[in-house]
Amino acid sequence: GWYSVKDESYYQDKELIKTGDVYTTKDGSQVDWIEEDSFFFKLSEWQEKLLNFYEENPDFVMPKSRMNEVKSFVKGGLKDLSISRTSFNWGIKVPESDHIMYVWIDALTNYLTSIGYPNITDEKMEYWENCIHIIGKDILKFHAIYWPAMLMAINHALPKTIFAHGWWTNEGKKISKSSGNTIDPNQMIDKFGL
């Protein structure tokens, strides 16, 4: 599928812009067509359940404009999600295979493993039941589509709310380590004090 190394993400055709022979995301990240053996999560089977959940829980994603983005994406059709890679050997290994977990699957499951899944105590479950994810808009589909479908697949409670904010910018561009335009907080403290 279409993969952006910069974003560490796969994209569907409907998410891309074609200029000549080059495909990019709406945010300008170049994507390349990659083929490799992979395990898949049957995301396509969760489309209707996700849409029903969004209708029954209208405040699941905030602000409403972000919820509208999520619903529109899901209504457009979901494809099964690649959850492993074979083109490199670092990362969390998939048991009894030569596959490595796709980085976003690893990252999302950390929310549960950090509180002891599958043996979550009642005390820690109380935190989960009141969980609010505060995320950047660029990782909304991972948190509001892929993650809820995965949780539904294991019959686990979903986070209470996902709040997706815009980006912090520096000279009009998204601040990110990969772009090299981050602001050093220590320099700001030296300049302005605490």
Range-by-range predicted roles:
Residues G1, Y11-T19:
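Short, flexible, mixed-charge glycine/proline-rich loop motifs
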